[in-house]
Every structure is written in C-alpha cells, then in structure tokens.
Amino acid sequence: MSEQVIIFDTTLRDGEQALQASLSVKEKLQIAFALERMGVDVMEVGFPVSSPGDFESVQTIARNIKNSRVCGLTRCVEKDIDVAAEALRVAEAFRIHTFIATSPMHIATKLRSTLDEVIERAIYMIKRARNYTDDVEFSCEDAGRTPIPDLCRVVEAAINAGARTINIPDTVGYTMPHEFGNIISSLYQHVPNIDKAIISVHTHDDLGLAVGNAMAAVHAGARQVEGTLNGIGERAGNCSLEEVIMAIKTRHNILNVHTNINHQEIYRTSQLVSQICNMPIPANKAVVGANAFAHSSGIHQDGVLKNRENYEIMTPESIGLKEVQLNLTSRSGRAAVKHRMEEMGYQDSDYNLDDLYSAFLKLADKKGQVFDYDLEALAFINRQQEEPEFYHLDYFSVQSGSSVMATASVKLICGEETQSEAATGNGPVDAVYQAINRITGYQVSLVKYQLTAKGQGRDALGQVDIVADYQGRRFHGVGLATDIVESSAQAMVNVLNNIKRAQQVEKEIQRLQQHNNQQQNDSKQQNSQETV
C-alpha cells in the first residue's frame, strides 16, 4: 500500500516574495480558495508578525479555509510565535511553522551564536508554539549546508521538544539530488526518534534542481514536500509543486507514494496564480506551459495521432486541460494538416491535400504558426499571407488620463475606402478597439491580450498578441510598434483581416456547395429525361 506525500503550498508566503507588489487580501483569499479546491494539505499563507497587512491576510484566510490546514511562518522569536497564534486561532485547523539557521556560516555570521545556543533556542520556541497547537513544524534553515552530524543533533532535539514535522530546506538551492537524498537517508539512519515526526523538504531552484532534489528526498523517505505553484519565489524560485505532484502520479510504479491532490484543478489553479501575480508561465514550463502538450514536429504529430502514449507520458485531461494541441508549423506533416481539416469538418473530397500541403508549407515558412482560418483560406480561396490585406491602420489618436474617460479616433483603409470613427472605452486600448468595431460593424470581443517587450531601453518595441472572439470563432492577431496602443491597434487590424479571409472562405464554400447541388440536379433531370 502506498504512503501519502503531504503537499505543503507556500505560494502565498515564499512565492509572494518574488512579486514586485504585495497581493491584496482579496487576491490572496482568491488564491487560497483555489488551493483548497486543488486539495493541498497545508497552505502557508504569510508571516503574521512582518506587517499589519500580513497579519490581516493570514487571519482572513484562516477564518475562511475549511478543508486545508492553514499555516503561519515565524522566526524562533517569542513575539513571532505569539502573533502567529493570534492570527491563526480562528482557523478550523492551523500549524505554526518556526525556523532557525543551522549551518556553520549562518550561525557564525548571521546569528553570531553557537550550535548549542541554536538548539537551546529551538527547543524553547517549539515548546512555546506547542502551547497554542499540537501541530508545530520546525525548519533547519540552510540545512543543505549543515554538516549531517550537526543536523541530526538539531532534528533529534526538535522532535523531543514537540515538533511533529521537521523541514529540511535547501535554502540556497546548493545541493545535488544525490546529496540531498543522502541527507534525508542519514536522518532516518541516525536520529533515534525520527519515527515520531514527518520529514519535510523545501527546495530552491538556484541551480535548476529544486524538483530533482525534492523527488530524491521523497525517494529517500521524505513525506512532505513544500513548494509553490509555477515555482514562483525569490531569486530563481521554489520547487514547482505541480511538477512534483505529476511526477508522483506518473512514476507511482517506482515511488509507491501518492498525494491527495485533485489533479483536475492543477491547470486552472496554475493559470489563476499566474494572472493574479502577473507572472506569465513560460511556454516550455513542464506540466502547465502552453507547449507542455503541444506537438510541432511532423514525426511526433503523426505518432500522437496514432497513439498519444507515443509522445505523451501524461494526458492533458489529467491536469484539467481538454485536449492535446497540435501546432501547425513548417515542421508539421501531411497527417497533421489532414487531421486538422477533419476536425473542422472537411472531407478528403472537399479539397486537394497535395495542393493544400504545398501552400501550407510556404505560408508556415513565412508566418510561423498556421491557424485554422489560414488553412481554410489556402484550401478554398488560395489566399497567401503576402497578398494585400483588406484593412489597414491609417491613423489613430488617443486622449486619456486619470480624470478623463479614454477617447480614441481611428481611421482605417477598408479596401478602396477610408473610414473613421471615434469611441470611448475603459482605457486607451479599449477605446481604440471600440472605434474599430464601429468602423467595421464587427462585434469583436477580446479573449486574450499579451504584451511582450522586444529589445531594451528607449528603442524597445512592444509586441501585442491577442486572441479575439467573433461569432463563436477565435482569431489571432499580432502587432509590433514602439507605442503599445499602436501595436494593440495593429493586432486588432490583423484579426479583422483574418475574419475577412474567413468570410471569403465561407462564401466560396457556399458557392461550391451550390455548384455541386446544381450539378446533381442537372444529372437527375438528364437521367429522368433519358428514362422517359
């Protein structure tokens, strides 16, 4: 029977340290509810003594969370522990997490103390925390650089004092997985009362080894892993909990452990943390990145279409994603193009695959990623990306400020005509988009907006990538300019041209259908006359 690995989330404490601005109480509570839905066992939600704002957020979360244990961090300082207990006492169940440094460097240069004094202080503070709760966690800060005999002394004393969870942090992300695994194994071998506590690990990613170290520790017997969603945290970040959780699930055959996480909530929670913290998830991020289940290579796409397990060790559905994504690029094969056309409802007889694939490769070489409406245009109206576009941005101006409603004037070249309109909006970009909608008559709604800086300093360009919805279909647009409002306008004009092309495709398909229907009717009439 497999053992449980406790998932200890510190997104709202250690993760928040990476943010340029602190989260509001409302934002923290929103993330806490998402973590609760995901099923984290323990959530560390702040450092109550650090500020009145942190105290308030810890207390608010403690009052509202019912199914996860709420934890507050403290130093080995009396006031820290007392304040944390005051903030947490409204919780259904809470934990006090106290820590002190144990490495020779930290003891000598930061604490200006001795190991014996550190142990004495830890014992006193653990006992003080036990006056408030039976659930006390103790951390040996910088355990990764603490000699193992010293670490064993500290851990044994902490357990005797009443700590029920002993956390072993690799505070500076220094250790290698085999070293870290050996530390955990050594504790099990040399600490006589180790069976009275759960061994936890808290790893940092300074050398890119946080998840590797955590997994080595689990393999060696650790039964709690601390980390954050998306690996956010100071410096290079923390251990990515979603990666640990899915590694445990995927490699259950060798680890023989499990978590109580609701895996279906992983993707949604990851996206929420990214949005609230304003920290975009890299496309190549394991498990939750945009490319984690996307396949661009023709060989890989063909293999996935035949059997997903050929190139997927876990399914997108297992983290709450609906389907695998095949990105159509110049590396995609004929099978992927044909599959995408079938997904859109087209049969082999509706188009010429040889001609379509040839045109697709030319467009993919120029454009990069090819979307559904591009394929349809190539298949039915033979429109290439380099042909003249119908809409062009001729002119725009924006007036906005803290005390005035944003107003935009926009002039578009629409084929051979020039049209202009003005509109107000919720900010300059929205005002421009409202004016564009008035000109075209399209009711286009923005689904996704992403701004990326290209270059540095005064010469930097702003690239805007958007996804917009029009009559239930998604269209992509890209704009690039030194002015982000201009690049936003260009991106929307790009969307409009894609919509225009899609409309031409629909007309051409209707024409072909009418032509085919007419041919069938003519054939029936001819057969009827011959019979007579």
From Swiss-Prot:
Co-factor requirement: Mn(2+)
Name the UniProt record assigns to this protein: 2-isopropylmalate synthase
One BP term from GO: L-leucine biosynthetic process
Keywords: Amino-acid biosynthesis, Branched-chain amino acid biosynthesis, Cytoplasm, Leucine biosynthesis, Manganese, Metal-binding, Transferase
Gene: leuA
Region annotation (Disordered) ranges: 513-532
Top EC class of this enzyme: transferase
Residues binding Mn(2+), per UniProt: D14, H202, H204, N238
Subunit structure: Homodimer.
Documented EC number(s): 2.3.3.13
Record field: catalytic activity: 3-methyl-2-oxobutanoate + acetyl-CoA + H2O = (2S)-2-isopropylmalate + CoA + H(+)
Organism of origin: Pectobacterium carotovorum subsp. carotovorum (strain PC1)
Domain of life of the source: Bacteria
Region (Regulatory domain) residue spans: 392-532
Classification lineage: Bacteria, Pseudomonadati, Pseudomonadota, Gammaproteobacteria, Enterobacterales
GO terms for MF: 2-isopropylmalate synthase activity; acetyl-CoA C-acetyltransferase activity; manganese ion binding
Database matches in PANTHER family: 2-ISOPROPYLMALATE SYNTHASE 1, CHLOROPLASTIC-RELATED, HOMOCITRATE SYNTHASE-RELATED
HAMAP family in UniProt: LeuA_type1
